[in-house]
Structures are given as C-alpha cells and as structure tokens.
Amino acid sequence: MTLTVKGQATRGRILDATASYLRSDAPGDITLDDIRALTGTSKGQLFHYFPGGKEELLLAAIRREADHVIGDQQPQLDDLTDRRGWERWSAAVVARYRELGAHCPLAALMDQASAPGAAEVISALLADWRSRLTRGIRAMQDAGEARSDADAATVAASVIAGIQGGVQVLRATGETDTLEASLALHLEYLSR
C-alpha cells in the first residue's frame, strides 16, 4: 500500500502508540479500542492501515520494537573491532537501558513472544544480533585483541543471554549493575 505523507504519519502514530503500550508496566491484552483512545483514530483508520486488524497491528509494532533493539545499539554495535569499540558499545547499551528502564523494546518483545508471528520476528532479531556480535568477536580475534580459543558464536550467544538477564533484573530493581557486570565479564573473558 502506497501512503501519502499524512497517511505515513498516521500509521506511524498508531505504531508508536501500540509499541509504547507494549512497553508499559502491564500491557495485558491490548484492544483496538485501546489503540483508538491512545491515537485519536477511528476504527476505519485502524483497518485502513492494518487490514488484518489487531494481529497485523501487533506484529507490525513487534517488528518496530525489534528494529529498535538493534538500532539503539548503533553505530557502536557494528564497530566492535577492538577493545575500545566493545567498551563504547557496552557503555552505550548500559546508558540506553538505564534511560529506558523497565520500558525497553527487548522486554516488550519477550513479553509478546506468544503473539502470532512474534516468535519468528524475535528469532530473526536474535540471529541478526548474534551474527553482528560474532563478527565483532572474530574481528578482535583477527587483530589479536581477543583470545583465539573462544568460540565467537557461543560467546555472542552468552552476551545476548547476559543482556537479557541484566534487563530482567533492571525491570525488577531499576538497577543496571547486573547488566554492567555481565558485559564487563564477557569482555574480560575475551581479553584473556
């Protein structure tokens, strides 16, 4: 569907409101009436931009949140070629999650994993994220800045698990110390 500038803005507003709702403290089961109230749009507009209704809207919002998980880490995520690059990326990750607190895209995605189509979006996100981290670890290994005996893909998976765990602790406590510790320990392991 080709949209006018105004149509793109309306669709974007609907997606932003849905994503914001998904990141709220207890989103529960969102309804189209909830989205209408948040956006000031009519049911007709919702179905114009999302003919598949609630399922299509939620999946589009989930895709947007997945894009934010990677986008929020740029450009540092794609510059993991040395220790300083990893330190900059780690600092950016911690700063972003500290800013977002419990209302982060990663947590919202995991909370919606059972929504139709969400598992595929989350799997693709995690594969992309792991691939980028793996490339960074291999670049460090090639430069002699990371231990050569480390399996880059396995360490990348562990980094993601550490971030996810740190985010869950952040959601419960409001503190980033677990996230910071996980990132620091992974870098220390690679640097041995």
Give, region by region, the residue ranges found by the protein language model.
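N-terminal intrinsically disordered/low-complexity leader segments
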Residues: M1-A9
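Helix-turn-helix
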Residues: R13, A17, Y21-A60
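Amphipathic alpha-helical interaction segments
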Residues: R13, R88, A92, A108, ...
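Amphipathic alpha-helical packing segments from all-alpha helical-bundle domains
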Residues: I70, R84, H103, G117-A143, ...
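Hydrophobic alpha-helical connector segments
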Residues: G71-A102, A152-V159
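Amphipathic alpha-helical segments used for helix-helix packing
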Residues: G85, R98-G117
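Amphipathic C-terminal alpha-helical segment
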Residues: R96-E99, A139, V159-D177, Y189-R192
